[in-house]
Amino acid sequence: MRSFLVFVAIICALPASADPVDLPRGAALRGELLDTLRPLVEYDLGAPVQFVVTSLQVDGDRAFARVTAQRPMGAPIDMNTTPMVQRDGLPLDTIDGPRIEAFFHQTVARWEVVEYVIGATNVWWWGYDCKHYGALLSEWGC
């Protein structure tokens, strides 16, 4: 009996394995993550941008977002006039619209964008860093 109680105590002390959390509209963390991503996207697409969230999930100190950028009031972004095309010379045929995928990591001080891509023409995040983002990408190859 004593061995069983020790086993139960050990199991209870282990961290629970939780599923990723979908952040609902209006959640403070959702706003914080989108505001962390916004300056990077505005550098590439021009300001201002708003995000339409397809998916935004958090798993502990990691997060993964799939969003589409638009102008205020829902106006579409003309990719031809964006800094990533005009300033950086990115060919339009290599950009599949203002869709963004982004990975985040929470440090002691704040959330940071680890990696993001705008207008990917492939599923670049397939199996991306499964060691750290596996729970967030379980349906995407991890």
Predicted regions, residues:
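Positively charged n-region of N-terminal signal peptides that target proteins for export
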Residues: 1-4
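Mature extracytoplasmic domains of secretory-pathway proteins
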Residues: 55-106
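Surface-exposed patches in mature extracellular/periplasmic domains of secreted proteins
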Residues: 48-56, 114-116
